[in-house]
Amino acid sequence: MLIWIGHVSYFMWRCFFIIHNTRVPHKVKVLLTIYLKKLNKQLPDLLNGFYLYGSISLGAFVEGSSDVDFMAVIQRDLSEADIAILKQIHKEIQSSYPQMSLDGIYITKEDITGLDTEAKTCIYFNDGEIQGTKELQKNSIDVFQFYNYGVCILGKEPSQYNFSIEWNLLMSRMQDNLNSYWVNWKKRGERFLSVQYFDLLFSVKSIEWGVLGVSRLYYSFNEQGITSKVGAGEYAINNVPERWHKIINEAMRLRLGNPKSYYKSIFARRNDALAYMEYIINESNKLRFVE
């Protein structure tokens, strides 16, 4: 009983820490406090560490647009019963906070410690639902962000995990991502009457995703670091020809939720987005990273 009381006291102290952490936006603090209380009540002693990365860790969280990206380090492998409870918790959080998707992974403390020598498999959640398992590698953008920028909510600081991340290998994999995912994404948008074709006309999310997505890679290839979507847009404004400034400003406008568009025609906006992506892909491929 004394152990249980001690654990709850420590847990409540961590909730107090969340409330007073200036790196965490207020509404995210509310969401996390509810989530962690649910988790502590239904799966006590599961968490070994809990961290935020992504836009929050970069100081670029946009309410109504940004996800809440997390990495949960857990004490043990998850049973089917554990997974069922996590599914319900994430479903409830998503229902209560539909504008802030709590997206992240659950990895055991043994696996995250061993991540420096080999890739590990972990389960992950997105938009309130379990998405199955994914392979986590130390030379990935997720681990790089966690290690270098992560916000510690529970457990030791991310830098204490002592990963030896190989930047050139990470850059090489990001370039592979550019020439597979992003090239194919752009091609689908160019295909007449495809779903992506219509998304680029009517879905503001697609314009933002495409334009700022490749801009982030362009920033990383040139500056050997990472930045937020808006940060990448601002960087591009200062480093690409004026021809592209209009579509970049439009993408940042959509990201920030500003109402006034830079375009009168959704067709012109779509065409500029695809042309800009083509330009950035070509410019990025002029750089080479050797593993």
Labelled PLM ranges:
Residues 15-51, 81-83, 290-291:
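Helical scaffold of the NTase/Pol beta-like nucleotidyltransferase catalytic core
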Residues 36, 40, 87-94:
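Short, well-ordered alpha-helical packing segments
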Residues 27, 31, 85, 268, ...:
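Soluble or luminal CAZymes and related metallo-dependent hydrolases
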Residues 160-291:
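Nucleotidyltransferase catalytic cores
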Residues 20-21, 91-204, 211, 217:
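Conserved NTP/Mg2+-binding pocket subregion across the NTase superfamily
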Residues 54, 59-88, 92, 99-108:
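Catalytic metal-binding acidic patch
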